[in-house]
A protein has these predicted regions:
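Charged, terminal alpha-helix-loop-beta segments
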Residues: 1-338
């Protein structure tokens, strides 16, 4: 009989979702770099992405500039890595010691070099064009540590995937979802009179944002910008995540406790505003709200808008669409164009 894998005091049977970070990692970051959290908060181009993978016993605390990961502190099996992890392209910008023991002044230099390097502009902002990464940072900050007393929800996770014990279990667990998606894509091709891409995928990778409102509803939010064709297809991608999380919520009776623990940890370390502490719902409602966010939606053609609505009505009729009130504030409002 095959033994079940015990991780962090619980058993991984098929899937897992537990992104609360190792406390040892956070303690060491606070001791060695007590300035780092306030530094990120004071720079509008920066945001946090954090996580944990109980299967590999790995936790991470990353700093992003748009969609570019510029620094990661990580731990494995409770041991904190001495050297920060970063993509090779960013390592070229600074001396090796920076990635072992960064200082605020060095970080200023690092950011200036990133901003002036052409190949990194696509991750955040070109001279006149605000890319998807710009809005990801803007919205990510707005609904975490910049959350307001009047807000009904917070974002508690970003760029995430559901974990699986094995690749075989993942394929088996997802099969009914992929089959359902594939059937609807076939139906779309038969019923939609406009032009569609030759290839439309039934399954996808990372969720952009997960949110939680005061009613206990989970919000799945997919961000699109600068690619109208992908905006039109976003209900298909969001439907995949919706079906995945719906199934996970049915099967994982500890999901609420793990989400609550993540949120409380982030509040304790200042990654989510303290005003939300008394708003955490007592349980999940069972409702999942699928959403697309278009940072700036005024440039979408009528063809794209019509295609989006057709696909939405087929895949996720309840899907909501949002846009930002401004390019500097990040508050979400219902899109009038979608």
């Amino acid at each position: 009989m095959k033994k079940l894998k015990m991780v962090n005091n619980y058993t991984i049977k098929t899937t897992y979702y537990d992104r609360k970070m190792d406390e040892k990692l956070l303690t060491q970051i606070n001791e060695r770099f007590p300035w780092i959290i306030s530094y990120v908060k004071s720079h509008n181009c920066l945001d946090f992405q954090t996580g944990n993978d109980p299967k590999t016993n790995r936790s991470w605390f990353s700093i992003y500039r748009g969609t570019g990961r510029i620094l990661t502190f990580c731990s494995h099996s409770g041991k904190v890595n001495e050297i920060c992890d970063v993509a090779e392209a960013y390592k070229e910008l600074m001396q090796p010691d920076f990635f072992r023991n960064p200082t605020p002044d060095q970080f200023d230099t690092y950011l200036a070099k990133i901003a002036s390097t052409e190949k990194f502009k696509r991750y955040y902002k070109d001279t006149e064009v605000r890319n998807e990464g710009y809005y990801q940072t803007l919205i990510g900050r707005r609904y975490t540590f910049e959350v307001k007393d009047t807000d009904d929800f917070i974002l508690f996770d970003k760029e995430l995937v559901i974990g699986f014990k094995t690749k075989g279990i993942k394929d088996e667990w997802n099969k009914e979802i992929v089959d359902q998606q594939t059937l609807k894509i076939e139906q779309l091709r038969k019923t939609y009179n406009g032009i569609l891409p030759e290839e439309i995928k039934p399954e996808y990778g990372e969720f952009d944002f997960l949110g939680l409102n005061t009613n206990g509803d989970i919000l799945i939010m997919e961000l699109k910008q600068n690619d109208p064709a992908k905006t039109a297809l976003s209900p298909i991608q969001t439907s995949y995540y919706y079906l995945q999380f719906q199934k996970l919520a049915r099967e994982d009776d500890k999901l609420y406790q793990r989400i609550k623990a993540m949120i409380e940890q982030k509040i304790d370390y200042g990654l989510i505003g303290s005003s939300y502490k008394n708003k955490i719902p007592l349980k999940l409602s069972g409702r999942i709200i699928p959403c697309v966010i278009v940072g700036k939606d005024g440039g979408l053609s009528e063809t794209i808008r019509e295609r989006y609505r057709f696909i939405r009505d087929l895949f996720l009729p309840e899907m909501k669409a949002y846009t930002c009130t401004s390019e500097v504030e990040g508050t979400l409002v219902t899109s009038e164009n979608l």
